[in-house]
Amino acid sequence: MTKYALVGDVGGTNARLALCDIASGEISQAKTYSGLDYPSLEAVIRVYLEEHKVEVKDGCIAIACPITGDWVAMTNHTWAFSIAEMKKNLGFSHLEIINDFTAVSMAIPMLKKEHLIQFGGAEPVEGKPIAVYGAGTGLGVAHLVHVDKRWVSLPGEGGHVDFAPNSEEEAIILEILRAEIGHVSAERVLSGPGLVNLYRAIVKADNRLPENLKPKDITERALADSCTDCRRALSLFCVIMGRFGGNLALNLGTFGGVFIAGGIVPRFLEFFKASGFRAAFEDKGRFKEYVHDIPVYLIVHDNAGLLGSGAHLRQTLGHIL
């Protein structure tokens, strides 16, 4: 067996590749490539392997799209490929293609305390189910359970469940967005584009015309307190994040913790801490006490997707995490 495996974390914009020490799980030599610069994922992998001059026979790539069979077509990119064909072309003995939040969930057992920031709740209960979700280009969701000394990730497309408002303001947001786009999923409000949707709906609810803002613009104006609409949008984003996380906690009794990943929340960490997130997380009526002690953590590891891809592959190859 070779010392290293190839691991990857591929989103709608970038492909991040690295080497994973098969024995220890340590990630090294990570490099990010723009997806727009390459015709295929295989082309990116070939460039990476050529640059690093290392023999690799095993690989695991996490991708931001559903993985339901051999054919993979990315949701937010034009890349599409056959897993079996790419494995053959690269000369790999083993190639795993997994959902990006499967990878993030598999990273959780590998994380240390310094990789986490806690938002309320008590200590996690060992051996109990775990939920992980995160907003970025879209909204990713997965669960993690421990069975027979193995970690089992339960991937899905939970980001596309219905947006479920629980206040008058949220109901108005739903009404406006439904008139524009039809079905309003949670991802339509909990993502970068979702933050824009919240801003636009807030402005339109007041019979005004919204500006053509990007997620970055809304966040910057909200933090600078220079735009009331942007601040309202960001505050509402935090509240809906809390409601959604609380729903995940109820679904599977995640007393092992609820973990937040994705690139959006760390950009306004202090704002998030002071927001209505935790109150919304616990706002479950008769089941408020049920979720009260469930801890929520923000993952602040720079390469959680790569770490989890490596963990998934190592476990598949017979290692105990």
UniProtKB/Swiss-Prot annotation:
Keywords from the UniProt entry: ATP-binding, Cytoplasm, Glycolysis, Kinase, Nucleotide-binding, Transferase
Binding residue positions for ATP: 8-13
Record keyword Ribonucleoprotein present: no
EC assignment: 2.7.1.2
GO molecular function terms listed in the Swiss-Prot or TrEMBL record: ATP binding; D-glucose binding; glucokinase activity
CDD domains: ASKHA_NBD_GLK
Pfam families tied to this protein: Glucokinase
Gene Ontology terms: biological process: glycolytic process
InterPro entries: ATPase_NBD, Bacterial_glucokinase, Glucokinase
The protein's name in its UniProt record: Glucokinase
Gene: glk
